[in-house]
Amino acid sequence: MRGELPDIPDELGAPSFLKRALKAVSPEDGGGFDRLLPHLLEVRLPAQYVGEEFGIVRKDWDTARLRLALGFPDLYTLGMSYLGMQVLYHLVNRPEEATPTRAAAAGGPYLCERVFYPNADMQELMQRYGVPLYALESKRPLRDFDAVGFSFNNEGAYSNLPRMLRLASIPVWQRDRSDDDPIIIGGGECMLNPEPVADFLDAVAVGDGEELILDIAHCLAELRGAPREKRLAGLSHVPGIYIPSFYRPVCDDKGRFARLEPHDDLPPGVYALERITKRLLNDFARWRPPLKPVIPWVDTASGSANLEVMRGCPQRCRFCHAGHVYLPARFLSAESVVNNTLALATNTGSDWVSLQSLSLLDHPEILQILEQLRPELDRSGVNLGIPSLRMDAVSREVAELMRRPKESSLTFAPEAGTQRLRDAVNKRIKADDIASTFEHCARAGWHKFKLYFMVGFPGETDEDVQSIVDLTRELNRIARTHGSRAPRINVSVNALVPKPHTPLQWAPLVHEEDLRRKHSHLRSEFRALGKRVRLSYTSYEEAFVETLLSRGDRRLAQVLALAEERGLVLQGDAELFDFDAWRQCWEEAGLDAEREVHGERSYETSLPWDHIDSLVRKRFLWSEWQHFLRRSPTPSCFEECVHCGLGCEK
């Protein structure tokens, strides 16, 4: 033993995670984790840094054909709630359990480990003792892996990527890496516009990770030991893989993004398409999710075991990024959902199992699922986690079936208070549906609710903003009238952040003075609704930076690099978000952020993500943008095919 285990106060519980970590430390790890171990109780939630959780997969380092680390550019408590990471970890380490036919073709064995963004106190500890960022399973430095894949499910994590690379002693800029450095890959929902972080990445995986990761692993295993240039050339032949260094951005005479084009002097063997097409998991219904996931030591953001029961959403709300990039809607069968839910509850010991989807009540067998799960879960005392629900699909029966032994809340997203604005964003729910849903839920015993609205839509009026207050007041009255307990309603009002590959990608961000005026009006009006109705909202500064990052081009990488050098963060403690310091970064990088965020865009305007084919045609998105401006809704995918480009009608 190379470090003495410190005394642990009784109130922290048994030091099992530290003892397991100490036992697992190998003299060959080369990262110096043993130097950290005696000091881990100096940091907050030390258990998140030791690994050794139940359900991990440990493989032999020396015999693995490929050593892959999955990086989540945010805290462990968030990353361990992210189902995508569990899915990919399970798929690489145990492919035969998830997709036997693909596993045989992909080869192996492959080794896959995890790494998360460390909190500031842990970063300081690592630097004090000279320990680079390491993977949790083997404790080996991240730089020792063949490849590191980062999942981005929100743009706020972008600023953490250069910091993680620096902590790992891996060159931040792709151009500075050598043959000895790992291949850095970006994936996840945000990589439908990878340009803001493209100069940090060697490769980008566009589309469903289950379709891509074994192909990536097989390619890199076959080329292991080859020069970096040859490995990237090999990856360029994998459908859905984009190699940013093979392309160059072209700007117009005013310094604005004009287009992205392949370099003229690409090395032999490179496959550089003008557009990269998203990979799609078509056989989602036959997909085998991880039923023995890694069980975290500490409480996570979701606090539940998670099961994805549906991918995509047929409703196509015009502001919704996930609703467009995950099209078409795909489902697990009722039998699979029920069996997998019960298996997850048994295997994890969790008293919560969350059914994850964008629009759960659009599942064609949802009533059957709830009817079969309710008695089984009641017997075992397990609660069912329900995501945001459509307000025109909750019957009295559904409201009763969703009730759980443990008190919780229901989440709804009306998005707008007036019918004309709901029609504009294609949120096709009527006022009567909203009222009846609340009545059903109150009669079924629900009394805690979360409501999500948005402001800042083009053409929005003061009446639209006031209607948020009026609708909340009416729903509060309904819940008081028909419920057995006084309701508690939390209302969140977010500013519209225009997202790539959505009809509102052409919309500007609301101006600062306009948003502040709307916030002021809402604060004043909500005070009259009482203490049991609470209002929260995102700031203009947060919306500004998110818009800049979500619709940005490669010039954003310099901004992010400057921010990392100055210790700026976008996520975590709101008090640490320094908008003026961020402004200084983009001004120093020569970026006109005001123009990027508030500028007008036409159909002919080149967009930084035009080279990424989401399978939904740009012409269709433009047509939907025109429908938004006319306040005209369009039918859901279930009602009528609108020929968006996916080819579902074939």
What does each of the following model-derived ranges do?
Residues L37-A69, Y76-T77, F257-N306, L615-H627:
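N-terminal [4Fe-4S]-dependent radical SAM core
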Residues L68-D74, Y89-V92, P293-F319, A345, ...:
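N-terminal pre-triad scaffold of radical SAM enzymes
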Residues G71, T77, G156, L342-K450, ...:
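Conserved SAM/AdoMet-binding glycine-rich loop
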Residues Y82, V298-E335, H643-K650:
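Canonical Radical SAM [4Fe-4S] cluster-binding loop centered on the CxxxCxxC motif
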Residues T101-A106, Y117-M122, M126-P267, P503-D553, ...:
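Glycine-rich beta-alpha loop elements in corrinoid/cobalamin-binding modules
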Residues G234-S245, L358-H363, P387-V394, G456, ...:
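A glycine-rich phosphate-binding loop feature that marks nucleotide/adenosyl-phosphate handling sites
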